Amino acid sequence: MPPRPRFDRRAPVRELPNINERIKYPQLRVVDSDGKQLGVIDRIKALEIAHQRGLDLVLVSEKANPPVCRIMDYGKYKFEQEKKAKETKKKSHQTEVKEVKMRYKIDKHDYDVRIGQAVRFLKSGDKVKCTVFFRGREIQHSNLAETLLLKMANDLEEQSEVQQRPKREGRNMIMFLSPRKTPLIKKEEG
């Protein structure tokens, strides 16, 4: 017995669309390319009508009784479907959680850089996890870290809303911000 090949070199089996001669049902409910019902016709006659018009007979609904077919240009139909799929894929944005890390003893410029990063993440539609991490005995100053996170939330209030207030989690203090759906209207002091 010859050894079995290590890799399956066969081409993947693609499910071919049910068009023209691949349709095996004897009776079909046929819809014209304009959307007009042609009624229940046998398969051979429906294929003749499609070929006379230079179009394809495409199985639309297999579960109906009798199955529904449509006379259309299959190449054009397939192109439109792929175009729609690309558009929906382009429009959909998966929200990710981006993290901005810092210590509670952060310098002004470093803080401004973290604010800039957070603004960029929020504008692209992602959530932001603001983390203040402690080393050694710094954990005793968790109130300063909470103050820093609240200041950050205040500085970012035009772009974001606080999803989770600052809370301690192990040796870190975290806060979650999400992009603001409606623009913030500032109250005028007068």
From Swiss-Prot:
One of its GO terms (biological process) is ribosome disassembly. GO terms for molecular function: ribosome binding; translation initiation factor activity. It comes from the Bacteria. Gene3D superfamilies: Translation initiation factor 3 (IF-3), C-terminal domain, Translation initiation factor 3 (IF-3), N-terminal domain. The keyword tRNA processing does not apply. GO terms for cellular component: cytosol; membrane. InterPro entries: T_IF-3_C_sf, T_IF-3_N_sf, Translation_initiation_fac3_CS, Translation_initiation_fac_3, Translation_initiation_fac_3_C, Translation_initiation_fac_3_N. It is found in: Cytoplasm. Keywords: Cytoplasm, Initiation factor, Protein biosynthesis. Coiled coil: none annotated. Monomer. IF-3 binds to the 30S ribosomal subunit and shifts the equilibrium between 70S ribosomes and their 50S and 30S subunits in favor of the free subunits, thus enhancing the availability of 30S subunits on which protein synthesis initiation begins. NCBIfam families: infC. Belongs to the IF-3 family. This is Translation initiation factor IF-3. It comes from Prochlorococcus marinus subsp. pastoris (strain CCMP1986 / NIES-2087 / MED4). The gene is infC.
